[in-house]
Amino acid sequence: MPGPTQTLSPNGENNNDIIQDNNGTIIPFRKHTVRGERSYSWGMAVNVYSTSITQETMSRHDIIAWVNDIVSLNYTKVEQLCSGAAYCQFMDMLFPGCISLKKVKFQAKLEHEYIHNFKLLQASFKRMNVDKVIPVEKLVKGRFQDNLDFIQWFKKFYDANYDGKEYDPVEARQGQDAIPPPDPGEQIFNLPKKSHHANSPTAGAAKSSPAAKPGSTPSRPSSAKRASSSGSASRSDKDLETQVIQLNEQVHSLKLALEGVEKERDFYFGKLREIELLCQEHGQENDDLVQRLMDVLYASEEHEGHTEEPEAEEQAHEQQPPQQEEY
């Protein structure tokens, strides 16, 4: 049943039909051709499984330019895709309504914010029956190769599902500033470098000493003054060395603490991933427990907050004493 507008895929088949229901709402159908027959599936995405490098594979610079052009971002490196925000907007572009851009953190700077965005992306993949497994644990690290592999796959997924409709990414974000995440390669613990001459104890004395008058012979400093100045310089050098040692120890302890937290996070993330795989294996059995587990895994922070509010209101309502009637 063809609709008023159609889009042709590269093989000549119609990729989308647009029809209207009884209420006049525009509903997209996506269809596939199997053995010469046309079959319709409601809201299904076209899955892409090929990840081999071909002539159509874009370079790192071309892929970033493509991302910035399509969704109006200002990314400069592939590693900045680790925030997941760009993928969320791509899904909203390909399948309007499958994800809420209000929940996407376009200004994400921390790893837990990246994970939040990828949880939203996972939920949209599940909603559209996308079979691709998102390697969240690798992507949020901001490593180049992991993020390049995923965006290369997503480019092919985009080409297979985009129907050519117009899309305004800035308007879709509703005014949210899409600030690129910081470069993951930057060192957090780098100390600012200062000029050795500026820190020299004799630099201030050289600037403050008045210019010698012409014709006058400058007096030589006594041995006592030279000894005192050299002693103060050695003491200041020792103080600076002690301060550097203390700062290095603090940096080392912070790095150890960070490694411990990351190991603990990876451990629990692996457990959740195993639970997710088990739920996906038994998802076709229509088990209520499996469905409830999937809802918990893919629930966003805002959704969890809303589910707790009604319970709190009910408890508050039960604790209120009954009002007395006025006579």
UniProtKB/Swiss-Prot annotation:
Residues annotated with Phosphoserine modification: S9, S219
Positions of the Calponin-homology (CH) domain: 57-159
Start and end residues of each EB1 C-terminal domain: 236-306
Chief site of localization: cytoplasm
Single GO biological process annotation from the record: positive regulation of ARF protein signal transduction
Residues where Phosphotyrosine is found: Y167
Low complexity bias spans: 200-234, 318-327
Region DCTN1-binding, annotated ranges: 187-327
Function: May be involved in microtubule polymerization, and spindle function by stabilizing microtubules and anchoring them at centrosomes. May play a role in cell migration.
Domain remark text: Composed of two functionally independent domains. The N-terminal domain forms a hydrophobic cleft involved in microtubule binding and the C-terminal is involved in the formation of mutually exclusive complexes with APC and DCTN1.
Stated family: Belongs to the MAPRE family.
Protein name, UniProt field: Microtubule-associated protein RP/EB family member 2
Protein species of origin: Pongo abelii (Sumatran orangutan)
Lineage, uppermost ranks: Eukaryota, Metazoa, Chordata, Craniata, Vertebrata
Gene from which the chain derives: MAPRE2
